[in-house]
């Protein structure tokens, strides 16, 4: 028998290796290094939103009631943006505005910046989580790449747009009706629906919905009917190892319907990835443009002719007048600190009126 005497080749683990072993251990809910960013940020963002919508008023920032405590419901409650006078202050609890007073911090709109930044980093943490897991199980990172699209939209709408304006005040508040108000604001002040980047975003989202419906229906239509047992459709069995539907049949069907069809599964699924992700990224780029007050399409010749000819009006000129109406009515209500007053005679009226 040979006995080897000497130093063990197995060195003791350092702190990093110990943490790595624990964080990336196979468990029911994966934690990972990304979880150090994701879980705290998601917890604080959601907790801040539930706290704000339940208890915190918007009286001091918008002159509105916005909490369940004041009588709002799920659709009308919101965590509102800080007042316009606070510009782009981070509104830290210990900052010069609140000076450590939690009640004052909530009244000033501190919860909005708290939720916006923790929410943004939480979303980034979720994308990193997908990268980390994909690397662990040797998958391509397309899930994480796809998730970059909603992150781009969130960051552009909630952070970049108000940074381009005079303050966080002009970002969307975190609530259902508040988001609707923001959409009306975008239309009235930026003519957003006529912006080509918005058009690409709509095409991407609705096109993706159409592709999802067609793809799901086609797969269900071409499931193999295997055997004559009690469970006729073995394709619904999650342990079935063989292919569950016929790509050849699907290709033949759509070739007859449209004259063209996907003949390759990889190209088909890449297209389903490409359409919505590109659409959302285009929308995000468009919102960055709005942050800089870039204009959408302007058809000035139609506006001039409509102004000169009482009988000439197009859907475009009607929409321009609607936008003027939104600006006139919304500015006075939405920016009470400006003390704007518009007499009846200056409110826009179309030629049809």
Curated annotation (Swiss-Prot):
Keywords: Acetylation, Chlorophyll, Chloroplast, Chromophore, Electron transport, Iron, Magnesium, Membrane, Metal-binding, Oxidoreductase, Phosphoprotein, Photosynthesis, Photosystem II, Plastid, Thylakoid, Transmembrane, Transmembrane helix, Transport. The modification Phosphothreonine is found at residue 2. Pheophytin a binds at residues 130, 143. Photosystem II (PSII) is a light-driven water:plastoquinone oxidoreductase that uses light energy to abstract electrons from H(2)O, generating O(2) and a proton gradient subsequently used for ATP formation. It consists of a core antenna complex that captures photons, and an electron transfer chain that converts photonic excitation into a charge separation. The D1/D2 (PsbA/PsbD) reaction center heterodimer binds P680, the primary electron donor of PSII as well as several subsequent electron acceptors. D2 is needed for assembly of a stable PSII complex. Chlorophyll a PD2 binds at residue 198. This is Photosystem II D2 protein. It comes from the Eukaryota. Pfam families: Photo_RC. One of its GO terms (molecular function) is oxygen evolving activity. Belongs to the reaction center PufL/M/PsbA/D family. The gene is psbD. The modification N-acetylthreonine is found at residue 2. The D1/D2 heterodimer binds P680, chlorophylls that are the primary electron donor of PSII, and subsequent electron acceptors. It shares a non-heme iron and each subunit binds pheophytin, quinone, additional chlorophylls, carotenoids and lipids. There is also a Cl(-1) ion associated with D1 and D2, which is required for oxygen evolution. The PSII complex binds additional chlorophylls, carotenoids and specific lipids. CDD domains: Photosystem-II_D2. It is an enzyme of class 1 (oxidoreductase). It catalyses: 2 a plastoquinone + 4 hnu + 2 H2O = 2 a plastoquinol + O2. GO terms for cellular component: chloroplast thylakoid membrane; photosystem II. NCBIfam families: psbD.
